[in-house]
Amino acid sequence: MRVAATTRPASSSAAAPLPLFLLLAVAAAAAALFLVGSASLAMAGHVLGGAHDAPSAANSVETDALARFAVDEHNKRENALLEFVRVVEAKEQVVAGTLHHLTLEALEAGRKKVYEAKVWVKPWLDFKELQEFRNTGDATTFTNADLGAKKGGHEPGWRDVPVHDPVVKDAADHAVKSIQQRSNSLFPYELLEIVRAKAEVVEDFAKFDILMKLKRGNKEEKFKAEVHKNLEGAFVLNQMQQEHDESSSQ
Protein backbone atom coordinates (compact mmCIF):
# COMPACT_ATOMS: atom_id res chain seq x y z
CA MET A 1 0.00 0.00 0.00
CA ARG A 2 2.81 2.41 0.92
CA VAL A 3 4.72 1.55 -2.28
CA ALA A 4 1.69 2.34 -4.45
CA ALA A 5 1.21 5.67 -2.68
CA THR A 6 4.80 6.75 -3.37
CA THR A 7 4.55 6.12 -7.14
CA ARG A 8 1.59 8.47 -7.81
CA PRO A 9 3.45 11.81 -7.36
CA ALA A 10 6.13 10.64 -9.78
CA SER A 11 3.63 10.07 -12.61
CA SER A 12 1.97 13.43 -11.88
CA SER A 13 5.27 15.32 -12.06
CA ALA A 14 6.15 13.63 -15.36
CA ALA A 15 2.95 14.93 -16.97
CA ALA A 16 3.40 18.52 -15.73
CA PRO A 17 5.58 19.85 -18.63
CA LEU A 18 2.89 19.03 -21.21
CA PRO A 19 0.41 21.82 -20.27
CA LEU A 20 3.30 24.33 -20.03
CA PHE A 21 4.48 23.41 -23.52
CA LEU A 22 0.96 23.83 -24.88
CA LEU A 23 0.63 27.23 -23.24
CA LEU A 24 3.90 28.38 -24.77
CA ALA A 25 2.84 27.11 -28.20
CA VAL A 26 -0.52 28.89 -27.99
CA ALA A 27 1.18 32.11 -26.87
CA ALA A 28 3.64 31.93 -29.77
CA ALA A 29 0.83 31.31 -32.27
CA ALA A 30 -1.17 34.24 -30.89
CA ALA A 31 1.85 36.53 -31.15
CA ALA A 32 2.42 35.45 -34.75
CA LEU A 33 -1.22 36.09 -35.64
CA PHE A 34 -1.03 39.52 -34.02
CA LEU A 35 2.05 40.46 -36.02
CA VAL A 36 0.51 39.26 -39.27
CA GLY A 37 -2.71 41.11 -38.52
CA SER A 38 -0.81 44.30 -37.68
CA ALA A 39 1.16 44.06 -40.92
CA SER A 40 -2.03 43.50 -42.88
CA LEU A 41 -3.68 46.50 -41.27
CA ALA A 42 -0.63 48.62 -41.97
CA MET A 43 -0.68 47.58 -45.62
CA ALA A 44 -4.42 48.18 -45.83
CA GLY A 45 -3.98 51.62 -44.36
CA HIS A 46 -1.28 52.42 -46.93
CA VAL A 47 -3.48 51.29 -49.80
CA LEU A 48 -6.50 53.18 -48.48
CA GLY A 49 -4.32 56.28 -48.39
CA GLY A 50 -4.46 56.30 -52.17
CA ALA A 51 -1.88 56.83 -54.85
CA HIS A 52 0.97 59.27 -54.30
CA ASP A 53 2.65 61.50 -56.85
CA ALA A 54 5.76 60.24 -58.61
CA PRO A 55 6.85 63.42 -60.45
CA SER A 56 10.27 62.05 -61.41
CA ALA A 57 8.59 59.03 -63.00
CA ALA A 58 6.38 61.07 -65.32
CA ASN A 59 9.18 61.45 -67.86
CA SER A 60 11.09 58.24 -67.19
CA VAL A 61 11.73 55.50 -69.72
CA GLU A 62 10.06 52.94 -67.44
CA THR A 63 6.88 55.01 -67.13
CA ASP A 64 6.78 55.59 -70.89
CA ALA A 65 7.05 51.83 -71.38
CA LEU A 66 4.13 51.24 -68.99
CA ALA A 67 2.03 53.84 -70.80
CA ARG A 68 2.80 52.28 -74.19
CA PHE A 69 1.88 48.89 -72.74
CA ALA A 70 -1.45 50.32 -71.54
CA VAL A 71 -2.22 51.76 -74.98
CA ASP A 72 -1.23 48.51 -76.73
CA GLU A 73 -3.36 46.41 -74.36
CA HIS A 74 -6.32 48.73 -74.85
CA ASN A 75 -5.91 48.50 -78.62
CA LYS A 76 -5.91 44.70 -78.44
CA ARG A 77 -8.96 44.49 -76.19
CA GLU A 78 -11.05 47.09 -78.00
CA ASN A 79 -9.68 46.60 -81.52
CA ALA A 80 -8.68 50.28 -81.40
CA LEU A 81 -5.88 52.21 -83.10
CA LEU A 82 -4.71 54.65 -80.45
CA GLU A 83 -1.22 56.08 -80.86
CA PHE A 84 0.74 56.92 -77.71
CA VAL A 85 1.99 60.51 -77.44
CA ARG A 86 3.32 61.15 -73.93
CA VAL A 87 2.82 60.69 -70.18
CA VAL A 88 1.26 63.71 -68.50
CA GLU A 89 1.21 62.54 -64.89
CA ALA A 90 2.29 59.45 -62.99
CA LYS A 91 1.26 58.22 -59.54
CA GLU A 92 2.01 55.03 -57.65
CA GLN A 93 0.06 52.97 -55.13
CA VAL A 94 1.53 50.15 -53.07
CA VAL A 95 -0.55 46.97 -53.28
CA ALA A 96 0.70 43.39 -53.81
CA GLY A 97 3.27 44.98 -56.08
CA THR A 98 2.69 48.47 -57.50
CA LEU A 99 -0.40 49.94 -59.12
CA HIS A 100 0.67 52.68 -61.52
CA HIS A 101 -1.89 55.46 -62.12
CA LEU A 102 -1.05 57.11 -65.43
CA THR A 103 -2.52 60.12 -67.19
CA LEU A 104 -1.43 60.05 -70.81
CA GLU A 105 -2.03 61.57 -74.20
CA ALA A 106 -2.85 59.46 -77.25
CA LEU A 107 -4.00 60.14 -80.79
CA GLU A 108 -7.30 58.73 -82.00
CA ALA A 109 -7.90 59.28 -85.72
CA GLY A 110 -5.47 62.20 -85.61
CA ARG A 111 -7.19 63.84 -82.65
CA LYS A 112 -5.27 64.16 -79.41
CA LYS A 113 -7.11 62.91 -76.32
CA VAL A 114 -6.33 62.39 -72.65
CA TYR A 115 -6.67 58.98 -71.00
CA GLU A 116 -6.27 57.59 -67.51
CA ALA A 117 -4.80 54.11 -67.14
CA LYS A 118 -3.99 51.80 -64.23
CA VAL A 119 -1.27 49.20 -64.69
CA TRP A 120 -0.60 46.56 -62.02
CA VAL A 121 3.01 45.37 -61.82
CA LYS A 122 4.61 42.55 -59.79
CA PRO A 123 8.32 42.68 -60.75
CA TRP A 124 9.28 39.46 -58.94
CA LEU A 125 6.74 37.49 -61.00
CA ASP A 126 7.37 39.36 -64.27
CA PHE A 127 3.65 40.20 -64.09
CA LYS A 128 2.05 43.21 -65.76
CA GLU A 129 -1.68 43.79 -66.29
CA LEU A 130 -3.86 46.67 -67.50
CA GLN A 131 -6.54 47.20 -64.85
CA GLU A 132 -8.33 50.24 -66.26
CA PHE A 133 -8.22 52.50 -69.30
CA ARG A 134 -10.64 55.36 -69.87
CA ASN A 135 -10.94 58.56 -71.86
CA THR A 136 -11.21 61.80 -69.87
CA GLY A 137 -11.75 64.15 -72.81
CA ASP A 138 -10.03 65.91 -75.66
CA ALA A 139 -6.68 67.57 -75.10
CA THR A 140 -6.66 71.34 -75.42
CA THR A 141 -3.52 71.69 -77.48
CA PHE A 142 -2.26 75.23 -77.05
CA THR A 143 0.97 74.38 -78.85
CA ASN A 144 3.40 76.62 -80.72
CA ALA A 145 2.01 75.31 -84.01
CA ASP A 146 -1.69 75.88 -83.46
CA LEU A 147 -1.73 78.82 -81.04
CA GLY A 148 -1.69 81.33 -83.87
CA ALA A 149 -4.41 79.47 -85.79
CA LYS A 150 -6.65 79.43 -82.75
CA LYS A 151 -6.57 83.19 -82.34
CA GLY A 152 -9.05 83.62 -85.16
CA GLY A 153 -10.81 80.34 -84.58
CA HIS A 154 -12.25 80.97 -81.13
CA GLU A 155 -14.77 83.50 -80.00
CA PRO A 156 -13.21 86.13 -77.71
CA GLY A 157 -13.43 85.63 -73.97
CA TRP A 158 -12.77 82.88 -71.48
CA ARG A 159 -13.97 79.36 -72.08
CA ASP A 160 -13.93 76.29 -69.84
CA VAL A 161 -11.22 73.72 -70.53
CA PRO A 162 -10.70 70.22 -69.02
CA VAL A 163 -8.81 70.26 -65.72
CA HIS A 164 -6.91 67.12 -66.79
CA ASP A 165 -5.58 68.78 -69.92
CA PRO A 166 -1.76 68.49 -70.04
CA VAL A 167 -1.23 72.18 -70.82
CA VAL A 168 -3.50 73.18 -67.94
CA LYS A 169 -1.52 70.87 -65.64
CA ASP A 170 1.76 72.42 -66.82
CA ALA A 171 0.36 75.91 -66.20
CA ALA A 172 -0.80 74.90 -62.71
CA ASP A 173 2.61 73.37 -61.90
CA HIS A 174 4.29 76.61 -62.95
CA ALA A 175 1.90 78.60 -60.75
CA VAL A 176 2.67 76.38 -57.75
CA LYS A 177 6.42 76.79 -58.26
CA SER A 178 6.01 80.56 -58.50
CA ILE A 179 3.86 80.66 -55.37
CA GLN A 180 6.47 78.60 -53.54
CA GLN A 181 9.27 80.95 -54.59
CA ARG A 182 7.34 83.91 -53.17
CA SER A 183 6.53 82.11 -49.92
CA ASN A 184 8.69 82.22 -46.80
CA SER A 185 7.11 79.06 -45.40
CA LEU A 186 9.29 76.12 -44.41
CA PHE A 187 6.69 73.75 -45.86
CA PRO A 188 6.53 73.39 -49.65
CA TYR A 189 3.26 73.76 -51.52
CA GLU A 190 1.83 70.61 -53.09
CA LEU A 191 -0.79 70.62 -55.85
CA LEU A 192 -3.73 68.48 -54.70
CA GLU A 193 -6.35 69.30 -57.31
CA ILE A 194 -7.17 71.61 -60.19
CA VAL A 195 -10.73 72.61 -59.29
CA ARG A 196 -11.57 74.68 -62.35
CA ALA A 197 -9.77 75.94 -65.45
CA LYS A 198 -10.54 78.46 -68.19
CA ALA A 199 -8.51 79.58 -71.19
CA GLU A 200 -8.44 82.46 -73.62
CA VAL A 201 -6.22 83.18 -76.63
CA VAL A 202 -5.22 86.84 -76.92
CA GLU A 203 -2.81 88.24 -79.50
CA ASP A 204 0.28 86.01 -79.37
CA PHE A 205 -0.25 84.17 -76.09
CA ALA A 206 -2.75 81.99 -74.25
CA LYS A 207 -4.13 82.87 -70.83
CA PHE A 208 -5.17 80.28 -68.26
CA ASP A 209 -7.38 81.10 -65.28
CA ILE A 210 -6.96 78.26 -62.79
CA LEU A 211 -8.49 77.55 -59.39
CA MET A 212 -6.25 75.14 -57.47
CA LYS A 213 -6.36 73.32 -54.17
CA LEU A 214 -2.90 73.23 -52.57
CA LYS A 215 -1.48 71.62 -49.46
CA ARG A 216 1.16 73.18 -47.21
CA GLY A 217 2.07 71.03 -44.24
CA ASN A 218 -1.24 69.86 -42.79
CA LYS A 219 -3.17 72.83 -44.15
CA GLU A 220 -5.15 72.90 -47.39
CA GLU A 221 -5.54 76.19 -49.23
CA LYS A 222 -7.15 77.38 -52.46
CA PHE A 223 -5.41 79.71 -54.88
CA LYS A 224 -6.62 81.37 -58.05
CA ALA A 225 -3.91 82.05 -60.61
CA GLU A 226 -3.69 83.54 -64.08
CA VAL A 227 -0.85 82.03 -66.09
CA HIS A 228 0.22 83.13 -69.57
CA LYS A 229 1.88 80.91 -72.18
CA ASN A 230 3.66 82.55 -75.12
CA LEU A 231 4.45 81.26 -78.60
CA GLU A 232 7.79 79.91 -77.36
CA GLY A 233 5.98 77.74 -74.83
CA ALA A 234 7.18 79.65 -71.76
CA PHE A 235 4.82 80.11 -68.80
CA VAL A 236 4.57 83.32 -66.76
CA LEU A 237 2.50 83.79 -63.61
CA ASN A 238 0.61 87.02 -64.26
CA GLN A 239 -1.36 87.19 -61.01
CA MET A 240 -2.49 85.03 -58.15
CA GLN A 241 -4.60 85.35 -55.02
CA GLN A 242 -5.64 83.10 -52.18
CA GLU A 243 -9.30 82.10 -52.13
CA HIS A 244 -10.99 82.02 -48.73
CA ASP A 245 -13.98 79.80 -48.05
CA GLU A 246 -15.23 77.52 -45.29
CA SER A 247 -13.21 74.51 -46.42
CA SER A 248 -9.93 76.39 -46.80
CA SER A 249 -10.27 78.35 -43.54
CA GLN A 250 -10.59 75.29 -41.37
UniProtKB/Swiss-Prot annotation:
The keyword Transferase does not apply. Residues 49-137, 156-202 form the Cystatin domain. Residues 1-32 form the signal peptide. The record marks G49 as: Reactive site. GO terms for molecular function: cysteine-type endopeptidase inhibitor activity. It is found in: Secreted. It comes from Oryza sativa subsp. japonica. This is Cysteine proteinase inhibitor 12. It holds the Pfam family SQAPI. SUPFAM superfamilies: Cystatin/monellin (SSF54403). A motif (Secondary area of contact) lies at residues 93-97. Belongs to the cystatin family. Phytocystatin subfamily. GO terms for cellular component: extracellular region.
